[in-house]
């Protein structure tokens, strides 16, 4: 991909303009979700061509509007300096790159946001508000465009590439692993453990005509020029993958990206992995690489039931093969087993790298505990939009 497209001129806001926008922060906090929900409705009706870049399930649940509202609020609070939210911004950049977001889509979002503010706030969204907001939005949009252009340059390929399904393996009663290889024979590079790939699914449903974008973690190292993803049946697309996808089917795939990557240069000798349910998928290559590097690895693995626990045999064998270097701690909700913070009391931040992924409530509980314990570099990410609740 070429150099970043210059769609907006970055013009620093004046102190007066910053104060004006920040004075509206309470309004954005209170009405933000209404504004963003209105924005998406307006945008999808006015610019239907962008629908295929959005997960419509996250629209129906309200998760995507909630995340965008949180993003706008945080941006307004940090207009002087984005450094405190740089991690959050970086996750947005990588998700945009994984989905193949183009610079030309930013004016569409900007115009839709302005219309939504006018509809929700009425006279409060006057000419002065619109002028200052457009200036601030343009600064943020061009910053993201520039950052995304830098990421695109590092990816293994541009755009989406057709992959063929080569194998389907049932890992649990509701989890299927999908093996895929490039149709054109492109040689896949080794992954960085923790990366994910984005897909554009046509699920052949007469009631759902839009292409469905989804992101899935790569659940093992590249072998035989194949990626593997492992998908739990919990939604429209995952149901299609588990019940209707067939060997030989073709699906477009974007190059890997990710924020929760294995830290191969860390000098710490121990790794603790906390995985809830299907959050185990990116942890598999992370665990394997950590063991190859000679680290002691502890896995705290929570599932609803034995029947819904993927990779049970794999981890059992891994524990046997590694002579005490890998310790598996299983927690099954149906058996009244639950990971407790007391199980993690021994984790010394100076000795352990810690990885965390699972349902939002699970992540919130253990992130709060681990950060309070002094784990300042906790490695975690979110399935779906970056969640403001965690």
Swiss-Prot record:
Cofactor note: Binds 1 FAD per subunit.
Annotated site location: Influences the redox potential of the prosthetic heme and FAD groups: 95, 381
Active site: 106 (charge relay system), 148 (charge relay system)
UniProt-listed Enzyme Commission number(s): 1.14.12.17
EC category: oxidoreductase
Names of the cofactor(s): FAD; heme b
Catalysed reactions listed for this entry: 2 nitric oxide + NADPH + 2 O2 = 2 nitrate + NADP(+) + H(+); 2 nitric oxide + NADH + 2 O2 = 2 nitrate + NAD(+) + H(+)
Modification N-acetylserine occurs at: 2
Record-listed NADP(+) binding positions: 277-282
One function term, GO molecular function aspect: heme binding
InterPro entries: FAD-bd_FR_type, Fe_red_NAD-bd_6, FNR_nucleotide-bd, Globin, Globin-like_sf, Globin/Proto, Riboflavin_synthase-like_b-brl
Globin domain ranges (all copies): 12-149
GO biological process, one term: nitric oxide catabolic process
GO annotation, cellular component aspect: cytoplasm
Limits of the FAD-binding FR-type domain: 158-263
Feature type site, description Involved in heme-bound ligand stabilization and O-O bond activation: 40
Residues noted as binding FAD in the record, renumbered to the chain: 196, 214-217, 382-385
Cited PROSITE patterns: FAD_FR, GLOBIN
Top-rank taxon, per record: Eukaryota
Alphabetical keyword list: Acetylation, Cytoplasm, Detoxification, FAD, Flavoprotein, Heme, Iron, Metal-binding, NAD, NADP, Oxidoreductase
Domain notes: Consists of two distinct domains; a N-terminal heme-containing oxygen-binding domain and a C-terminal reductase domain with binding sites for FAD and NAD(P)H.
Protein name listed in UniProt: Flavohemoprotein
């Amino acid at each position: 991909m070429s150099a970043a497209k210059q769609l907006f001129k970055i013009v620093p806001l004046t102190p007066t303009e910053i104060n004006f926008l920040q004075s509206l922060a309470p309004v954005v906090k209170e009405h933000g979700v209404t504004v963003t929900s209105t924005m998406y409705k307006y945008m999808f009706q006015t610019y239907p061509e962008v629908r295929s870049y959005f997960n419509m399930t996250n629209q129906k649940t309200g998760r995507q509007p909630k995340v965008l509202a949180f993003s706008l609020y945080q941006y307004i609070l940090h207009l002087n300096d984005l450094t405190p939210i740089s991690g959050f911004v970086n996750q947005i950049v990588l998700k945009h790159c994984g989905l193949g977001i183009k610079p030309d889509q930013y004016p569409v979002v900007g115009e839709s946001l302005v219309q939504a503010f006018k509809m929700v706030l009425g006279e409060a969204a006057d000419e002065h508000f619109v002028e200052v907001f457009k200036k601030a939005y343009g600064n943020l949009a061009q910053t993201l465009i520039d950052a995304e252009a830098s990421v695109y340059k590092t990816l293994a390929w541009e755009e989406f590439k057709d992959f063929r399904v080569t194998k389907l393996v049932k890992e649990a009663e509701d989890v299927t692993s999908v093996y895929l290889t490039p149709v054109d024979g492109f040689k896949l590079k080794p992954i960085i453990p923790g990366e994910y790939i984005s897909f554009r699914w046509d699920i052949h449903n007469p009631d759902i005509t839009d292409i469905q974008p989804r992101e899935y973690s790569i659940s093992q190292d590249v072998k035989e020029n194949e990626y593997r993803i492992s998908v739990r049946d919990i939604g429209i697309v995952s149901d299609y993958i588990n019940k209707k996808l067939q060997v030989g089917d073709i699906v477009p795939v974007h190059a890997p990206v990710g924020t929760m990557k294995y830290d191969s240069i860390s000098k710490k000798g121990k790794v603790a992995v906390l995985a809830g349910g299907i959050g185990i998928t990116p942890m598999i290559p992370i665990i394997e690489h950590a063991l190859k590097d000679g680290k002691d690895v502890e896995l705290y693995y929570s599932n609803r039931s034995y029947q819904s626990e993927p990779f049970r045999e794999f981890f059992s064998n891994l524990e046997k093969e590694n002579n005490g270097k890998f310790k598996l701690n299983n927690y099954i909700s149906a058996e009244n087993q639950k990971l407790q913070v007391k199980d993690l009391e021994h984790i010394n931040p100076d000795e352990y790298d810690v990885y965390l992924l699972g349902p939002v409530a699970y992540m919130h509980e253990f992130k709060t505990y681990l950060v309070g314990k002094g784990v300042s570099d906790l490695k975690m990410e979110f399935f779906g939009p970056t969640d403001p609740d965690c």
